[in-house]
Design a protein with these regions (language model features):
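Short helix-capping and inter-helix turn/linker motifs at the boundaries of alpha-helical repeat units
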Residues: 59-61
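Short secondary-structure boundary micro-motifs
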Residues: 2-4, 54-57
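Hydrophobic protein-protein interaction segments
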Residues: 9, 53-54
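Conserved amphipathic alpha-helical segments that form helical-bundle/coiled-coil interaction surfaces
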Residues: 1-48, 64-72, 80-94
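C-terminal effector-binding regulatory domain of bacterial HTH transcription factors
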Residues: 78-120
Length: 120
């Protein structure tokens, strides 16, 4: 659980730095707006997923997205960076579905108890 806590801290820092380094007021406002939505923050499900067998794979996918977006930015490939971040944001929806399906660690995300999977 300690490793997941460290990941949450580092992940939040990465996203904050990426946001800050963009130096784009409209982009910063939009990311701040979206991040404030329920279940949409960068690490919204990390702790709730910590006991799942898929947790490691999910984190590796997210980290790979981070590496790819940094590479795209370094190479001035704006469209690629945008596409990668759009895909990265879709992980939140995937993670929400996984959290609803598994219902583990509801104590960490009490609002999940209000949601039902499409199978219910």
């Amino acid at each position: 659980m300690e490793a997941f806590s460290a990941y949450v801290t580092m992940n939040a820092r990465f996203h904050a730095l990426l946001n800050e380094l963009s130096a784009s007021s409209p982009l910063i406002r939009e990311i701040d707006r979206v991040s404030a939505l329920p279940f949409a923050s960068p690490s919204a499900f990390v702790m709730a997923q910590s006991a799942l067998p898929e947790a490691h794979q999910i984190l590796l996918i997210g980290q790979d997205h981070h590496r790819i977006v940094v590479d795209a930015i370094e190479n001035r490939e704006g469209a690629r960076a945008e596409a990668v971040m759009r895909e990265h944001s879709r992980l939140a929806a995937r993670n929400l579905r996984l959290a609803i399906r598994n219902r583990t660690h509801l104590d960490l995300l009490p609002a999940l108890a209000l949601l039902k999977s499409s199978a219910e």
